[in-house]
Amino acid sequence: MNCIFLSVLFIWYFFFVYVKNLSILQYDKAKVLFIQNNFEPLNNNMLRVPLNILRKRTYVVKNKKNGVPFQIFLSSENDEGLYYELNPENVEKVLNLIRPKLQIDNGDVELVDIKNNDLYIRLLGNCVTCSSNSITVSHVIKKTLKMYIRNEQNQEPNVIITNFDEINEQNIQNCLSQLKPYLDFLKVEVIIKELVNNKENINNYVCLKFLNIENSSEEINIPHNVKNEITERLKQKFPTLTVNFEN
């Protein structure tokens, strides 16, 4: 009898423990699901706000990177074929578009003269003293004037930068002055013996002569590398110029 009673108690105890553990397990599982559902990044409204802000900020940065750079000229004028007539007033209008950029670096540009289809322009200030910058500025000025100016035959003007493009003794001497320290070391100077300059830029010719600073009557021998350097400097400034040496 006692054995039967103990067996019944054992069965009831086992059943009670099993039911209790099952309820606890279901509660923990529900709690885990609650945590998972409420902290899912894609379903959490609290996390969506900062993500949206980040996306907007990223979009703004991308827009800044893809922004159109500052442009001086309006392309619509040229695209429609609207040009200014070749005269001093219209040339000044176009140059006024360029001047603000040049004046930032203490430079400027001025109209010298207009002869037929030749447009003579002079660089001023730092536009001349900085050789590397002057080449870029000259190119921009030429391109801009040719873009907006036309003569009576609807032709582009022949833009001549007098500081560099015009072949004359002063510009040649200015180019040679860049080599003056080296020539002074050799105790020689370079003079222009003959200069032929055609308006058509055909057969332009210059003949140079070396003189001894201490004794001009004394003959001197100049190394070929010095002559080559002088020739290259002049050809860079005046591509149509032929350079020869008397001695």
From Swiss-Prot:
<protein>
    <recommendedName>
        <fullName>NifU-like scaffold protein</fullName>
    </recommendedName>
</protein>
<keyword id="KW-0411">Iron-sulfur</keyword>
<comment type="function">
    <text>Binds and transfers [4Fe-4S] iron-sulfur clusters to target proteins.</text>
</comment>
<dbReference type="Pfam" id="PF01106">
    <property type="entry name" value="NifU"/>
</dbReference>
<comment type="pathway">
    <text>Cofactor biosynthesis; iron-sulfur cluster biosynthesis.</text>
</comment>
<keyword id="KW-0933">Apicoplast</keyword>
<comment type="subunit">
    <text>Homodimer.</text>
</comment>
<keyword id="KW-0004">4Fe-4S</keyword>
<dbReference type="InterPro" id="IPR034904">
    <property type="entry name" value="FSCA_dom_sf"/>
</dbReference>
<dbReference type="InterPro" id="IPR001075">
    <property type="entry name" value="NIF_FeS_clus_asmbl_NifU_C"/>
</dbReference>
<dbReference type="GO" id="GO:0020011">
    <property type="term" value="C:apicoplast"/>
</dbReference>
<dbReference type="GO" id="GO:0051539">
    <property type="term" value="F:4 iron, 4 sulfur cluster binding"/>
</dbReference>
<dbReference type="GO" id="GO:0005739">
    <property type="term" value="C:mitochondrion"/>
</dbReference>
<dbReference type="GO" id="GO:0005506">
    <property type="term" value="F:iron ion binding"/>
</dbReference>
<keyword id="KW-0408">Iron</keyword>
<keyword id="KW-0479">Metal-binding</keyword>
<comment type="similarity">
    <text>Belongs to the NifU family.</text>
</comment>
<dbReference type="GO" id="GO:0016226">
    <property type="term" value="P:iron-sulfur cluster assembly"/>
</dbReference>
<keyword id="KW-0934">Plastid</keyword>
